[in-house]
Amino acid sequence: MAEITRTSQVPKISRDQIVKIEFWPVDIPITDPFVVATGARVVAENIFVRITLHDGTQGYGESAPFPEVGGETRDSCLTTLRQLAATLIGESAGCYALLAAEMAQTAPFHPAARCGLETAMIDAYCRSTQIPMWQLWGGQDVRSRETDITIPIATLEKSVSLARGWYAQGFRLFKMKVGNDVDQDIRRLEAVHHSLPGISFIGDGNQGFSREECLAFAKGVRRFGGALVLLEQPVVRDDLDSMTAIRRDTGVPVAADESVRSLADARDVIAQSAADYINIKIMKTGVVEAVAIAEATLAAGLKLMVGGMVETRIAMGCSFSLVLGMKGFDILDLDTPLLLATDPVQGGYGYRGAQLEPWHTSGLGITTLPQSDLTTIE
């Protein structure tokens, strides 16, 4: 890794000066195997981050690598965190945007690691100024919001069983993981459709379809009368021509997910009219760049979706803060804490069925306790 070039240094001790950074691995079982077209997880192998400021304020962040999607592993994140954390000691948390840009220069291929530090910095800064994190982004849309629920790739019977359980809790928008077998994917959606009235589907291919397979999938869902409201990343990330063709030939809106891992990627998708939505995920880009991508998306007249990897309410709370702070997020895919067997976080936003409920305390409003294998940088 290259060394960060210092563009500013805090000349005197300030109340928001970073004095200590701690991080530790957390293993959280996933209730049902999280199977997507590119791989499967049964345990969320994440990292929690805590930053302490000179005035004693503490902020929390989370790194949630998903190797099958982003290429990062927990080990690579831990290595990157050790290197980047040392560069933040003595800096002002209020300079989070500048520090995020410097970290992106130094570790461009480790966004999940950077995201953990960015989130903790921003959380600490918001707590020190006594504002909820969503207020930092404008506080323009503070209200309860509905999320979808994810059904992983599974047998037909398991898919129906999972969907019925979530339906009973109030979920009506089902994000179906697809992309392994077109015929089986169609059968799974059809079985869920006939089991539950008044539902809609997102088909999330995770790059698993070819153009022809995706067209066949959309046609098959239309044939049985399913409400397919979105096709998320149906083909490989660089195949923007197919994304454009799928939009045109199916009439179903398309969301770019893996295709957008940077602001430059977002501009390419926009220029080629390859998507109707861009899916904002802080683990793909870090928090500050996610905000820039969201702003560029809205300015270009596209719509916003927000999602995540397999995250707890720390990272997901940061993403929800963008929804509450900025206008324009139409589709929320902020469900992964519900897929975990335990919740290691106290406070913050909450779930009421399919509704996410805002919080009004400072920062993310959450706390959690360090576990074993604690690393401290000061």
Residues of each region from the PLM?
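Oxidoreductase and adenylate-handling cofactor-binding alpha/beta cores
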Residues: S319-K327
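Surface-exposed amphipathic alpha-helical tracts and adjacent flexible/coil segments at the periphery
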Residues: E3, R313-I314, S321
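N-terminal capping/lid subdomain adjacent to the active-site entrance of alpha/beta enzymes
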Residues: A2-F201, N206-L215, K219-R222, D249, ...
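Catalytic core of soluble alpha/beta enzymes
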Residues: M176-M316, A341-P344, Y349-Y351
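Structured loop/turn residues at beta-strand edges in well-structured enzyme cores
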Residues: D16, Q169, G226, S273, ...
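Short glycine/serine/threonine/alanine-rich loop segments
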Residues: G90, I131, V252, L302, ...
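Short helix/strand-capping turn motifs
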Residues: K327-T336
